[in-house]
From Swiss-Prot:
The keyword Secreted applies. GO terms for biological process: defense response. The keyword Secreted applies. Belongs to the frog skin active peptide (FSAP) family. Aurein subfamily. Keywords: Amphibian defense peptide, Secreted. It is found in: Secreted. One of its GO terms (molecular function) is oxidoreductase activity, acting on paired donors, with incorporation or reduction of molecular oxygen, reduced pteridine as one donor, and incorporation of one atom of oxygen. Expressed by the skin dorsal glands. Has no antimicrobial or anticancer activity. GO terms for cellular component: extracellular region. This is Aurein-4.2. It comes from Ranoidea raniformis.
Length: 23
């Protein structure tokens, strides 16, 4: 559903932020 999609996008966004910080 929509909520699941939002959760997935938030996970991707958080992962991108973590990757950016570590770089």
């Amino acid at each position: 559903g929509l909520l699941q999609t939002i959760k997935e996008k938030l996970k991707e966004f958080a992962g991108g932020v973590v990757t950016g910080v570590q770089s």
